C-alpha cells in the first residue's frame, strides 16, 4: 500500500498526484477528526472509567450525623473541655491509691482522758475491795533484814527467805544449809488453828549464782475458797536430812496469814466522791507533761507522789 492509497482512505476527496509521505503525515496530524482518534477513543474512555472506579473511596462504617442533629446537640449541651486525669495502677491493674475519710474530733481529748481516768478509779476501788477480803502477810519479809536472816539461817539451818500472796495462792522461797546431799523440805500449814495441817513439799531450785553452802527451795500453796474469820492460818518449815530434822517456826510465832478487814468507810467515801463528781459533770484540773504522766498532788492518784505509800514487803533483790 502506497501513500496515495493511504490518503484516499483517510480523505476520499480527490487529491493531486504525486503524493509524498510527508504530505500523508501532515494530513494525519492536521485532520479535524482523524479516524485513528475516533478508533482509539473507546479504549481511552474505558481506561479512564476503570481508574475512577479503582480509586473510589469506600463508604465509612460510622454513621455521620446530619447537620440538624449536630446543631441540636450543640444548643442543648454547651461545649466543655474534659479535665485531665491521672490514674495509677498496681502490678495487678487495680487501683494503687485508697481514700480514707477522717472526721474531725468534736470532743476534747482531755475530757475523754479524764473520763477514762474516772472509770479506772472505779475499777481500782473494786479491786481494793476485793483484795481486802483476802489474806495478807502477818509478818515482815525475812530477807528484808539481811543480817538477821543470815543469823537465823546459820542457827536453824533453814529459814524462810520471802513470801508473797497472789490472788488465792501463797508462794515463797526457802534457804537451807548444805549439810547433807539428800534434803527434803516441807511447808506445814493449817487453815483451822492447828486442828489439822497439811505438809506441802518444796521444789529444789538450781542456784546459778548462789553459794555452794546454801541451797534454795520454792513452794506454792493454794488457799481455800473460804476460811472462817475466827480460824488461824499459819505455817512453818521443816528441813529433813538423813538423820536430822530442822525447823523454822519464826522463833516460836509461826508465819501467820491474817484476814484483812474490809475498810467500808474508806470505800464509801471514795464512792460518794466519785458519785458527786459525776453528777456535777466536772473534772478537776490536771496538768500533763509531754510524757503523759499526771503531775498533781490532789488528782486521781495522789499516792503516786509519795514514797510513804510504797510497801516494803517485796523481796530484797
From Swiss-Prot:
Record GO cellular component, one term: protein phosphatase type 1 complex
Superkingdom field: Eukaryota
Keyword Plastid listed: no
Keywords: Carbohydrate metabolism, Glycogen metabolism
Example of a GO MF term: protein phosphatase 1 binding
Domain CBM21 stretches: 150-258
Residue stretches in coiled coil: none
GO biological process, one term: glycogen metabolic process
Gene3D superfamilies, alphabetized: Carbohydrate binding type-21 domain
Family annotation (InterPro entries): CBM21_dom, CBM21_dom_sf, Pase-1_reg-su_3B/C/D_met, PP1_3C, PP1_regulatory_subunit_3
Keyword presence, Cytoplasm: no
Domain notes: The N-terminal region is required for binding to PP1, the central region is required for binding to glycogen and the C-terminal region is required for binding to glycogen phosphorylase, glycogen synthase and phosphorylase kinase.
Summary of subunit composition and partner proteins: Interacts with PPP1CC catalytic subunit of PP1 and associates with glycogen. Forms complexes with glycogen phosphorylase, glycogen synthase and phosphorylase kinase which is necessary for its regulation of PP1 activity.
PANTHER family tied to this protein: PROTEIN PHOSPHATASE 1 REGULATORY SUBUNIT, PROTEIN PHOSPHATASE 1 REGULATORY SUBUNIT 3C
Function (record text): Acts as a glycogen-targeting subunit for PP1 and regulates its activity. Activates glycogen synthase, reduces glycogen phosphorylase activity and limits glycogen breakdown.
Protein name: Protein phosphatase 1 regulatory subunit 3C-B
Organism lineage string: Eukaryota, Metazoa, Chordata, Craniata, Vertebrata
Gene: ppp1r3cb
Amino acid at each position: 500500500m502506497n501513500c496515495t492509497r493511504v490518503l484516499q482512505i483517510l480523505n476520499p476527496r480527490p487529491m493531486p498526484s504525486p503524493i509524498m509521505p510527508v504530505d500523508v503525515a501532515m494530513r494525519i496530524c492536521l485532520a479535524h477528526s482523524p479516524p485513528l482518534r475516533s478508533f482509539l477513543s473507546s479504549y481511552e474512555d474505558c481506561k479512564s472509567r476503570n481508574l475512577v472506579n479503582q480509586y473510589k473511596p469506600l463508604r465509612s462504617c460510622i454513621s455521620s450525623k446530619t447537620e440538624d442533629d449536630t446543631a441540636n446537640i450543640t444548643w442543648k449541651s454547651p461545649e466543655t473541655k474534659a479535665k485531665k486525669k491521672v490514674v495509677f495502677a498496681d502490678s495487678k491493674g487495680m487501683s494503687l491509691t485508697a481514700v480514707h475519710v477522717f472526721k474531725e474530733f468534736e470532743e476534747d481529748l482531755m475530757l475523754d482522758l479524764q473520763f477514762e481516768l474516772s472509770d479506772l478509779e472505779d475499777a481500782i476501788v473494786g479491786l481494793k475491795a476485793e483484795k481486802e477480803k483476802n489474806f495478807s502477810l502477818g509478818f515482815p519479809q525475812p530477807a528484808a533484814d539481811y543480817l538477821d536472816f543470815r543469823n537465823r539461817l546459820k542457827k536453824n539451818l533453814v529459814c524462810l527467805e520471802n513470801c508473797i500472796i497472789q490472788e488465792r495462792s501463797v508462794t515463797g522461797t526457802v534457804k537451807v544449809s548444805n549439810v547433807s546431799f539428800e534434803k527434803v523440805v516441807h511447808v506445814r500449814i493449817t487453815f483451822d488453828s492447828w486442828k489439822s495441817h497439811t505438809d506441802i513439799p518444796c521444789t529444789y531450785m538450781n542456784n546459778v549464782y548462789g553459794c555452794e553452802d546454801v541451797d534454795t527451795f520454792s513452794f506454792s500453796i493454794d488457799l481455800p475458797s473460804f476460811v472462817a474469820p475466827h480460824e488461824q492460818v499459819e505455817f512453818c518449815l521443816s528441813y529433813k536430812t538423813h538423820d536430822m530434822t530442822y525447823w523454822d517456826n519464826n522463833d516460836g510465832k509461826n508465819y501467820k496469814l491474817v484476814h484483812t478487814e474490809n475498810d467500808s468507810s474508806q470505800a464509801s467515801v471514795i464512792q460518794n466522791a466519785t458519785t458527786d463528781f459525776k453528777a456535777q459533770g466536772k473534772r478537776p484540773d490536771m496538768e500533763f507533761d509531754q510524757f503523759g504522766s499526771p503531775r498533781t498532788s490532789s488528782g486521781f492518784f495522789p499516792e503516786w507522789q509519795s514514797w510513804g505509800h510504797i510497801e516494803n514487803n517485796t523481796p530484797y533483790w
